[in-house]
């Protein structure tokens, strides 16, 4: 192992044009969000050697001239790539695709923490570098890089940008409600953390005990999320009948303009719109009965489900429509026609959302307003008071493009959002 602990040595290393195959930043805090801590040191591996570049660890002198573009190539596997914003490949995604399970560094490196106090925020700066090295050198490489790994790496990097906005909270009540350690609440901001390492790619979102993706709607938890701006507001864009409309795109079915998809299907069911929602949910996720198969929309859905399943069984994989990701047969346990279709639907929803998030973040570049949360069929924006009308117009246009209507809700906090007529 080669230790680089001076700027002179680091510049010399850059000049050698190293071909780095793996990069693993170890952050000073094992618990804090990456946007709330610093890099302790960077572990690098080439084909014939490995290196540690020190920045904040107490075992060595410190460098401060990090230039990731001089170290990371498009083919470098980078752990936590979304927080370094490099052009490399997301190591965790590549690992998940190869082994079918997530790679969690703190669990992989569990042995380095034995005998140390877990409540010290900057613990990773204190555990001996050689102890770290003995673990990091065992991180497995993946050499078979599929084409879609890069597309997903780019999308996961987009999630990192979304996390970076932070979420302004009512500190006292947030700490009380979630038993949150204020040491991890810089200037009243909490951080989301998306976990996209799932079979369908759809991310969960949990950090330090807060489940952002499934925050309770009835116990006041959401009231703790507020705007960071004086006179600011929270705007949420909700997709209308999102899954039904995605399915319509998949099967080639057009819904009439001027009515919601649920209103459209209610006419065939002969029930109210509210009852229509429940029936559609039953048919889409529980299977179609003979009555449903007599409805034009579900006739197309039934044909599509059978076609997808037949291709899945023959090829041994499920290929997503947008990113062309291949999900192996064995990753879908108990693969029935309905289950395979549901996996495909969830994967497509996720890929559409990744593209939409990228467009929204690009649109918000240079603006004060921030996108702060994504929950499958809803996007939450923290809006500066001078940008409200612009957000309502421009972001609504982006989200609805492609035939996906949204409704906008506004509130002073995440709990009191009301529909904007």
Language model features by range: what are they?
Residues 2-5, 14-140:
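Conserved DEDDh/DEDDy metal-dependent 3′-5′ exonuclease domain
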Residues 2-4, 8, 16, 23-50, ...:
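Acidic, glycine-rich two-metal-ion catalytic cores of nucleic acid-processing enzymes
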Residues 69-82, 238, 290, 373, ...:
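Short glycine-rich phosphate-binding loop at a beta-alpha junction
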Residues 78, 241-243, 413-414:
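Conserved nucleotide-binding/hydrolysis micro-motifs of P-loop NTPases
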Residues 88-146, 155-165, 207-208, 216-337:
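Helical catalytic core of nucleic-acid polymerases
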Residues 121, 161-171, 288-289, 379-393:
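Catalytic palm subdomain of template-directed nucleic-acid polymerases
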Residues 151, 155-156, 390:
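RecB-family 4Fe-4S metal-dependent nuclease core
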Residues 287-294, 302-346, 382, 386-421:
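C-terminal polymerase-core module
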